[in-house]
């Protein structure tokens, strides 16, 4: 077997030279020592700067979710304007339909005889009847029977009904 067993050595990928690896480690140690030698005020200043940058990154990320882009804002405003235009068009249509209905109502209310050719003027404040009332015809019992309607005769009050 082997007389001198060597311990396996692991080499960093990309640097095959042990000397360059040792130099890099020495430089890293020196830089670490420089970082630890900072005064307390320098450390506090650096920490506050890091925290401020971290807070600004978080705020920027949060705002990117909650704020609306200019394109989206333009689209929303366009949709609102379209809705307002539709509402205006509908109200104009409704007003024109109301005017037409009033004219037709006025024409229906005018007498058909040639003696009454003067036109009545209807203002917007005049109430328009919305319900139609139908009068009931008064009929006698004989007319009801002639129409086929049979009703029970009314009972006169008797002693039994008066006692209760």
From Swiss-Prot:
UniProt subcellular location: Nucleus; Chromosome, Telomere
Amino acid composition bias (Polar residues), ranges on this chain: 111-123
Region called Disordered, residue ranges: 1-72, 95-164
Cellular component annotations (GO), alphabetically ordered: chromosome, telomeric region; nucleus
InterPro entries: FAM192A/Fyv6_N (IPR019331)
Compositional bias annotation for Basic and acidic residues: 19-47, 58-72
Top-level taxon of origin: Eukaryota
Keyword presence, Nucleus: yes
Alphabetical UniProt keywords: Chromosome, Nucleus, Telomere
The family this protein is said to belong to: Belongs to the FYV6 family.
Functional summary from the UniProt entry: Involved in telomere length regulation and promotes fully efficient non-homologous end-joining (NHEJ) by a mechanism activated in postdiauxic/stationary phase.
Protein name: Protein FYV6
Organism, scientific name: Kluyveromyces lactis (strain ATCC 8585 / CBS 2359 / DSM 70799 / NBRC 1267 / NRRL Y-1140 / WM37)
